[in-house]
Amino acid sequence: MRLNSSAPGTPGTPAADPFQRAQAGLEEALLAPGFGNASGNASERVLAAPSSELDVNTDIYSKVLVTAVYLALFVVGTVGNTVTAFTLARKKSLQSLQSTVHYHLGSLALSDLLTLLLAMPVELYNFIWVHHPWAFGDAGCRGYYFLRDACTYATALNVASLSVERYLAICHPFKAKTLMSRSRTKKFISAIWLASALLAVPMLFTMGEQNRSADGQHAGGLVCTPTIHTATVKVVIQVNTFMSFIFPMVVISVLNTIIANKLTVMVRQAAEQGQVCTVGGEHSTFSMAIEPGRVQALRHGVRVLRAVVIAFVVCWLPYHVRRLMFCYISDEQWTPFLYDFYHYFYMVTNALFYVSSTINPILYNLVSANFRHIFLATLACLCPVWRRRRKRPAFSRKADSVSSNHTLSSNATRETLY
């Protein structure tokens, strides 16, 4: 990718060019991609620059590579999240999980699925291949960014809520019985989606379709871009970054660290006290016997809980770092090299962004043997080829033994993992 050296409006520019303009500032060159959802194509970014004189040329190999990656993520993510949602919606699946965790998993699968279905095709078409004109109208522009941000908020908040649910279930099981009723969980998840929609409302007033041609009439000048002052755009970006990344990341990191420490203690107690560990909060505790195989499962759970936090940071941190570049890099610091870096960094970070919507079903299958069994059974029902591969004798699970003054279902032990 390169920025052509000639500036818009320089001598020799044909006067009849509809994109001709005397001057185009850095603000226009960065405003659209500064929100993190538009490409760095300069013919779109600069108000009236002739595409032949000031352009960002992404080589065809990069476009093909990004397209191949996006298509792979789209197929894996769509299938994985669809099967996950279908699995969690089945009556038998809900009975097997016997907790409210399936509501959180289902909500997260829905937000990931919507992110892939609503955002990826538009981005691949209008921000990777066809930078301008914007093809979906003003309502499409505002709606695209609104829905994309709403799904982003929903995904982040759903991951955080799942961590809260697991924290209560593992560290405070008695409180969890009271606080995590099905009706309360449904209301809580509904509140998450409502909050996500409200947090995304500013995008309806921030983005819009504009014609950046010199006469304001040329169809090739239509772009989807911020329509408000740059300073306000930067505020919206920073608020979005805090609410959709920093806040959820802190919640996830803190709670999963506590959960991992708790599971580590349970594993140590089980090893030292003959497979018996203590579970409970400050005011009530009880001892619980764990089958030998559960010790290894708990160790695995500690590792995977850490992997969940790492995956969230790896997939989302570069994406938000790129968006914040627009806020904190001054006009004078933007160079042709930085433009090049930004454009390709955009492709990498957005690919990671979509990885986060694809990887969750994979993590569920890695973490929970119970979920994996149900997931594969559902996939076998939907896919005849997979059904033939999975023909084998059924097996039964032994219930976990519990010794305490309280009664705890065997599945409560299995559900210490996601």
UniProtKB/Swiss-Prot annotation:
Annotated disulfide bonds: C141-C224
Name of the molecule in the record: Neurotensin receptor type 1
PTM entry text: N-glycosylated. Palmitoylated; this is required for normal localization at membrane rafts and normal GNA11-mediated activation of down-stream signaling cascades. The palmitoylation level increases in response to neurotensin treatment.
Lipid linkage positions (S-palmitoyl cysteine): C381, C383
Residue ranges that the UniProt entry lists as topological domain Cytoplasmic: 89-102, 165-184, 260-303, 365-418
GO molecular function: G protein-coupled neurotensin receptor activity; G protein-coupled receptor activity; identical protein binding; protein-containing complex binding
Gene3D superfamilies linked: Rhodopsin 7-helix transmembrane proteins
Glycosylation sites noted in the Swiss-Prot or TrEMBL record: N4, N37, N41
Gene expressing this chain: NTSR1
Organism field: Homo sapiens
GO cellular component: cell surface; cytoplasmic side of plasma membrane; dendritic shaft; dendritic spine; endoplasmic reticulum; Golgi apparatus; membrane raft; perikaryon
Entry function: G-protein coupled receptor for the tridecapeptide neurotensin (NTS). Signaling is effected via G proteins that activate a phosphatidylinositol-calcium second messenger system. Signaling leads to the activation of downstream MAP kinases and protects cells against apoptosis.
GO biological process, one term: negative regulation of release of sequestered calcium ion into cytosol
Quaternary structure annotation from Swiss-Prot or TrEMBL: Interacts (palmitoylated form) with GNA11.
N-terminal signal peptide: none
Parts of the chain on the Extracellular side: 1-67, 123-142, 206-234, 326-343
Domain-related comment: The ligand binding pocket consists mainly of extracellular loops ECL2 and ECL3, as well as transmembrane regions TM6 and TM7.
InterPro entries: GPCR_Rhodpsn, GPCR_Rhodpsn_7TM, NT1_rcpt, NT_rcpt
